[in-house]
């Protein structure tokens, strides 16, 4: 039996990741009519745009599900978000603005926890709403098979019969009305939105065109800080970490990471913090564009990186950043639980995060405009007296020590100048006359 089923397996249990929206509602009812036994599974990821989670399973049962379950994924999502923060697992950046991989983190949690719940119900066929052009189809495929090696994949959107009968939203709405549910198709937005507790992604439709920007987006986790009529007042905020774990905001301690993220989202969201516009490479190497929100993660990230820079040495920070870039790509590709990803994140959590204890105080203003006001930690290696421009007692080194250190540099300076001479003889550089700086030569004619 093939792993990916191209036709509906009639008479068999088919699990569907059910959001309650038009697409999955129509798919569930259609599968029921065609003789399958649909089981609906809904992930509670703390989506900021979902008003009533409990209503979703009830809706699935009305549409013909054999069973409908709501799976609370928020705590696991919070833990994975903190792990990504500790490891700096963010590789999509533009001019200092960071995408915090919030959708890939949500898929890692959803893809494992929903399939585990299906397995409990003896459901070994899974469908979801991801399209063949996106990243999610591969992420869910990997996480599903990692969780249940016997899993088979059925996606209505890859079934030609489903496409022929219900190929668009208008057809789906008409189908649900005909079935007696009177489903009213929601008004079309100029873009699509996917969200969880960690962040929101806005993409597609008008946002596929680069002459449409952030200003057409209605934020769901914060304020439209670019609008002149939106009042944003400066706010002083403190964030405290203990051994790499965020534990307090504005002096209030949180034992529940979910509640901490929700409060961080409220604080950052008041300013529009963490909203950015990115062009990125999808898994299949084609470029896509997204507008992202992540107010809470952005707030925690600023404080965490400030402490990292004050506590760890340059080589450790360099390794942390290099590993974070690689780990971010693995997370984006749906490989968060692969051995190489586990190795990279464990390294950061053990040897970087465990030393990160302290409090950072910031002033948040508008959008990503902020200032760091204070950094406190018992583990700081930053010590102002070491490099003070004033005379200090017990100085760590003297002028004579620096003379000796500079004298030792003569060795590599001589070697470097000799090497530049070699390049000049080869025609790669010009050291003409008493030139103080080497200049690149024209080697276009050399083979």
Swiss-Prot record:
Enzyme class: ligase
Zinc as UniProt keyword: no
Keyword vocabulary terms for this entry: Amino-acid biosynthesis, Arginine biosynthesis, ATP-binding, Cytoplasm, Ligase, Nucleotide-binding
Cellular compartments annotated: Cytoplasm
Alphabetical list of InterPro entries matching this protein: Arg_succ_synth_type2_subfam, Arginosuc_syn_C, Arginosuc_syn_N, Arginosuc_synth, Arginosuc_synth_CS, Arginosuc_synth_type_1_subfam, AS_cat/multimer_dom_body, AS_multimer_C_tail
Binding residue positions for L-aspartate: 131, 135-136
The keyword Cytoplasm is assigned to this record: yes
Location, primary (coarse class): cytoplasm
Subunit structure: Homotetramer.
NCBIfam families: argG, PRK05370.1
Protein name: Argininosuccinate synthase
UniProt organism field: Paracidovorax citrulli (strain AAC00-1)
Gene name linked to the record: argG
